[in-house]
Amino acid sequence: MRILYLQNALNFTEEVVEIFGDLLNKGMNITELVARIKELTDKLGREAIEAIIEELDRIIKEDKRRKEKWVVERKDKKRLTTVLGDIEYERTYYKSKEDGRYTYLVDDALEIGRHDRIEKGVKIKLVENAIEESYERSSKKACPEELSKQTVLNAIREIGEVEVKREIKEKKEVRGLYIEADEDHVPLQDGRDETPRLVYIHEGREEKNGRNVLKNVYYKAYVGEKPEDIWIDVANYIEDNYKEEKIEKIYIAGDGAPWIKEGLEWIVKSRFVLDRYHLNKYVLKATSKEPKYRDKIWRAINEGDKEGVKKVFDELIKAAEEEREKEKIKEAKKYILNNWEGIKIYSEDEDVIGCSAEGHISHVFSARLSRNPLGWSREGLKLMAKLRVFSKNGGDLREVEWGKKKNINAGSYKLTKKQIKEAVRRVKTSTNEKINNITVLNIGKVTPIYRVLRALKYAQVI
């Protein structure tokens, strides 16, 4: 193993020198240079990993502790896709003297599952990329090897429904809380639509770097859940994170959909706030043929004058010449009056800050979920919706407990610090001996090749 590792390092040195020569003689731009060096370092990395795993396998095989508990059966090859590309190594298969179990101890020590074909780092990259891009694009970016769209979906299924769990040292005291909600409309593969729902809780707005942002915002995604289950979950979040007895007001903002208003039944001290985006949409709809009435409607709305709003709409209906136009105005009137409590609150409560749900639904959901021309499976949609809010909440996939069953042999063997130090010492000693025998380093003349090799020898930057 040590000879192989050193040979790989020397081959790497020769190829770096060759690339340097091409740069001087033929010329290349920075993109070409980076691509060639990356290809080279990835190759060296793969070879180093293979050599290290096989060295660890040899150390385990020689270990007295192993000999007391495990019997050697045979050697097998394993191929594993990593972020550096495919690696292939040989490792020893053992049988337990205690219970007759079979396992590869070096795989157990490195947490490589018996049936794993792709290492966790690749799966994480696949999922991270898929949060922002299509499965196909994600599969092409995770590693040098060609992976399928199904492989991406399998990785997403393996990680399951993820959620950022905030560490709560002490419940917060706030006077007011803001809950905003909206839904997206996403086509499914069976031709139907699904409506993933977004709810986010925050403490108002604050200025950061010259921009108004939501303070301590936390996002939640729901696909297929009943409204009551959504609001029970939101209520539990509030109870877990805030001292409810200190909260004076909670605002639930949205477009007035029944599922959003149901939150008023579950969230204590809550009042509804109509999203100004949808309010404006219906005002424009009603006055599209008679824009002169627009200011009148807004004046009545801003003054909290419900009777005034009714009066202007009645005038509009009379002025409309076509029956279809009358129906459109009546629909807008009905929408505004049905949501009047969520409109007049703007003129009654100075703490109301409006609603940004339409922009958030576009950014969090639509940017990824509504742009799949082939449609989603119901399962894939739910998992992706959860992943989108997981990402928005600052989640790290490396910290998540993946849903796959744990290897029953995990922990069968662990390397001791002494073994690790000895393995490192062997490699370092042999490497130094080999490099010290390179003629170019011993001549003393400073050349480009000398600089490259010297940097490798002393682990310096070239």
UniProtKB/Swiss-Prot annotation:
Pfam families: UPF0236 (PF06782). InterPro entries: UPF0236. It comes from the Bacteria. Belongs to the UPF0236 family. NCBIfam families: transpos_ISLre2. This is UPF0236 protein TTE2489. It comes from Caldanaerobacter subterraneus subsp. tengcongensis (strain DSM 15242 / JCM 11007 / NBRC 100824 / MB4) (Thermoanaerobacter tengcongensis).
